[in-house]
């Protein structure tokens, strides 16, 4: 199962399995003006099937970015730069999917990595060994099915530190991003910026090659805390009507998959402990302290 945990290290997720979190205005600075899988060997390829349909490396449809969406991205990028005090070195890469397409990508990406990482019989031996220790009680095939389904429903958006692409599901046939989609994109844009300030791909590859991930949890926790904080800043600019509208725009996520408890330890670490650690750092030195903790 360790290889699956390593796969999760590559993905920076906005969880869809947890309850909605409200922004905390009391923890925000007063000036909130806005200017507007481990897949280590996967090559990201965008293919054009015909004049109207573009697909990703797994043949899953990518939605077209309208001029209005591009302007919204520009505004959200400017907001992230303003709130973090940092600047993108290049325009962030992103893929937009339908919700079902995003879920298909999440499953396909995991299965692609699964085929590359596990030798014949290795997965079966790993699961049966854990069965002997009283951990999962499912068969190897059932456990694989559960993990694939978990990958499909576990996130509302993601950033992959290896190919440096943020991926977000949006509604089809709309010219502008709704508030829910913008909020998710803000979170992932922070990770995209972090990936440009730090060479996260090289950082991860070095850890994987040396089989030493000791430095990962601390930095990842702070990275999630910073992304959550900037997302909360953005949501704090919404009035009560817009907050209600954003809540109504959230897709009807269903994630009833139940995995062994230890599968959730990384999520608790990054999204619970990380948030508390980030708030402590931020309360002592504001965003500059978070940047220093991450980048120095």
Can you say where each PLM-predicted feature lies in the sequence?
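Short pre-active-site segment immediately N-terminal to the catalytic Zn-binding motif
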Residues: 153, 166-186, 218
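Pan-zinc metallopeptidase signature
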Residues: 258-296
């Amino acid at each position: 199962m360790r290889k699956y945990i390593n796969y999760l290290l590559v993905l920076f997720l906005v969880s869809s399995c947890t309850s909605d979190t409200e922004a905390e205005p009391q923890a925000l600075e007063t000036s909130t003006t806005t200017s507007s899988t481990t897949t280590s060997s996967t090559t990201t390829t965008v293919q054009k099937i015909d004049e109207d349909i573009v697909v990703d490396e797994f043949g899953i449809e990518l939605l077209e970015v309208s001029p209005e969406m591009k302007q919204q991205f520009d505004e959200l990028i400017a907001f992230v730069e303003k709130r973090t005090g940092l600047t993108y070195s290049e325009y962030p890469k992103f893929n937009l999917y339908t919700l079902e397409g995003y879920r298909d990508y999440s499953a396909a990406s995991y299965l692609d990595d699964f085929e590359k990482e596990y030798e014949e019989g290795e997965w079966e031996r790993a699961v049966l060994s854990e069965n002997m220790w009283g951990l999962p009680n499912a068969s190897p095939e059932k456990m694989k099915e559960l993990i694939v389904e978990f990958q499909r429903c576990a996130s509302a958006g993601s950033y992959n530190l290896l190919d440096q692409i943020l991926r977000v599901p949006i509604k089809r046939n709309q010219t502008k991003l709704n508030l829910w989609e913008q909020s998710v994109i803000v979170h992932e844009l922070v990770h995209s910026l972090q990936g440009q300030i730090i060479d996260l791909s090289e950082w991860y590859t070095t850890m994987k090659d040396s089989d030493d991930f000791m430095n990962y949890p601390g930095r990842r926790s702070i990275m999630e805390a910073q992304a959550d904080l900037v997302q909360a800043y953005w949501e704090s600019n919404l009035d009560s009507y817009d907050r209600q509208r954003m809540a109504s725009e959230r897709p009807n996520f269903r994630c009833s998959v139940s995995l062994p408890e230890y599968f959730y330890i990384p999520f608790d670490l990054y999204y619970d402990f990380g948030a508390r650690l980030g708030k402590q750092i931020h309360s002592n030195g504001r965003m500059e302290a978070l940047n220093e903790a991450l980048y120095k």
